[in-house]
């Protein structure tokens, strides 16, 4: 006996409706963070060739404002990003301990290559090395949360 395709599809959809992924446990989260820091993200020992200066920080803030604010907000802490609570995996605050524990070289590697499948795109070929390193300086000295307002793209 052949079941109509709509019956099979309906049974499959009902079965899938009950499926839900649980958030990772603490040990799963810590394992992923450890693996990212020690195995998946390159350039751990690379040093930022740009010294910290207000001009380099301003350059980093400018580059960040063109390429990063849609997901990370003007302050790097997701302020004013309307979809922030609906993204999986979640977009981290760049002030978080997890992000700040990367070396400068690892942060540049992430900016260059992105983190798949998180949605973080790579910028290799789009931004110069100096722009990337200046963004790293900006990330190390983020302004206070909420102090930069909401990205313009979300206020119109």
Where are these regions (language model features)?
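Sec-dependent signal peptide recognition
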Residues: 2-9
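Flexible coil segments in periplasmic/lumen-exposed cytochrome c-class electron-transfer proteins
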Residues: 24, 42-46, 65, 118-156
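C-terminal motif of bacterial Sec signal peptides marking the signal peptidase cleavage site
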Residues: 16-18
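Sequence context surrounding c-type heme c attachment/ligation sites in exported
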Residues: 58-69, 84, 101-106, 126-129, ...
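Bacterial signal peptide processing site
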Residues: 20-22
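Electrostatic cytochrome c docking/interface patches
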Residues: 27-63, 150, 156
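Periplasmic/extracellular electron-transfer cofactor-ligation site
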Residues: 39-40, 55, 61, 65-88, ...
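Extracytoplasmic electron-transfer domains, predominantly the class I c-type cytochrome c fold
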Residues: 85-141
